[in-house]
Structure formats: C-alpha cells, structure tokens
C-alpha cells in the first residue's frame, strides 16, 4: 500500500460523488494541483466534512492513488475563512480567485508564489470587507499572471521595444504596444497602463485605484492575455 503524505492546500472546488463521498480539487503548497477523494465526508457523523469546504485552507494527510486521484485520510483546518462566507461580495470574489487558480494552474509542479498569493487573497477577503472590489480582484489576477509566467510586457513596446507613445495593448504581441505596432490591438489609457504596472508591484491590500473605464480596459487586457497565451477563458470581473 502506498505510504501517506502530508501537505497543506486550499480547497478550490468540491463535487458530490456517490452516496457520501466528495471529489476535491485542491491547490497545494508543495505539490501544485491535486485531485482527491474524501470518503464518507457527507455523512452526518463525519469529522472531516466541515473541514473540507471550498475556500478552506487545510492541513491534509493523503494516501497516494494509482492515478491522479488520492484519498484523504486526515484533515485539520488551518483557516476556514468564516467571515467571507457571511458576505456575498467577499464570497463571490473568493470564488472567482479559486476558479482562476483552478483553470490556470493545472500542473502538479509546485508554485509557491501562486499558493501564497491565493492564501493572502482569501485571508484579505475574510478580514477586510472593503477588499471585495473590482480593482482588488483585478490586482489579484495580474499577480496570478505573474506567478504563472504570463505577465504582459508593460515597460516597452512588446513588439519593437519602443519606450514612448505606448497607448495600446496587444495580447498577441505580449503586452503594450506603440503606434507602429498596434495592428490587432485595442486602446489602453495611461490610467489603465499605470494600474497594470501598480498591480504588479504593490501589495494586494494596497492595490491601485482606477476609474471604471480604466478597469474595463485592464479586465480586457488580462482576459485576452489569458486566452492567447494560456488558452484559458475566465469570466470577466464585474
């Protein structure tokens, strides 16, 4: 029988399976994406059931599976994020964050920056009701792009290297572009450009502010970057 292993993970999604089990999609600290089955957790007397809810951060003991599905044999709560579950806006933003990680990071290779980013996002949404904003959610996505290796070029034209007159964005080129390279691009305001740069370098809790018009451009830039380079389509941030 395979030896059990321990890891810490965030529950991204939970799906009912059979009469009493659940299939879990997890993102772990040291093993990347993990699929697992938690047997019997939907029974009333199960001690693990309440610890394996989506958005929870948990310390797990798992038994190695033959394929991609491991078996949960033990679970302890690290952070259940109880307060964000009481606020619709916070819950929606947290669910969006977990969905983005689920769709973008499908490898079993560990990505500690991405894991730490997700944990920070959930903790922030749990503790700060005012954090559940469009601007903050887009800042998380920009940082996730960076952690996944898909951050766009923002310092110079992604096509030719020009550093002035940068007023458009092209996902196919890889970022911001100059007038001479703007075929297939869309206009990007200076405010939206500043937001994109600031979102990468500033802490999540201190994300840049921007108008709704600029945030719409940011959302489009992130979405098109994901679609073109990662072949992932996420629901736009409203």
Give short role names for the model-derived ranges.
Residues 1-238:
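Non-catalytic alpha-helical scaffolds and adjoining flexible linkers that form interface surfaces
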């Amino acid at each position: 029988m395979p030896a059990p292993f321990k890891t810490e993970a965030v529950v991204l999604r939970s799906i009912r399976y059979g009469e009493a089990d659940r299939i879990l999609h997890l993102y772990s600290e040291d093993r990347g994406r993990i699929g697992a089955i938690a047997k019997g957790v939907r029974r009333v007397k199960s001690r693990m059931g309440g610890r394996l809810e989506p958005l929870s951060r948990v310390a797990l003991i798992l038994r190695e599976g033959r394929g991609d599905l491991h078996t949960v044999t033990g679970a302890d709560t690290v952070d259940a994020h109880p307060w964000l579950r009481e606020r619709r806006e916070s819950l929606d933003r947290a669910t969006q964050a977990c969905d983005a990680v689920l769709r973008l990071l499908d490898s079993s290779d560990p990505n500690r920056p991405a894991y730490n980013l997700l944990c920070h996002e959930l903790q922030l949404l749990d503790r700060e009701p005012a954090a559940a904003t469009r601007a903050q959610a887009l800042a998380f996505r920009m940082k996730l792009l960076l952690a996944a290796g898909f951050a766009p070029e923002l310092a110079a034209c992604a096509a030719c290297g020009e550093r002035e007159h940068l007023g458009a964005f092209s996902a196919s080129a890889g970022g911001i572009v100059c007038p001479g390279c703007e075929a297939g691009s869309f206009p990007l305001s200076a405010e939206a450009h500043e937001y994109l740069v600031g979102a990468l370098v500033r802490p999540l809790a201190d994300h840049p502010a921007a108008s709704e018009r600029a945030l719409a451009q940011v959302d489009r830039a992130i979405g098109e970057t994901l679609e073109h380079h990662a072949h992932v389509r996420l629901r736009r941030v409203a």
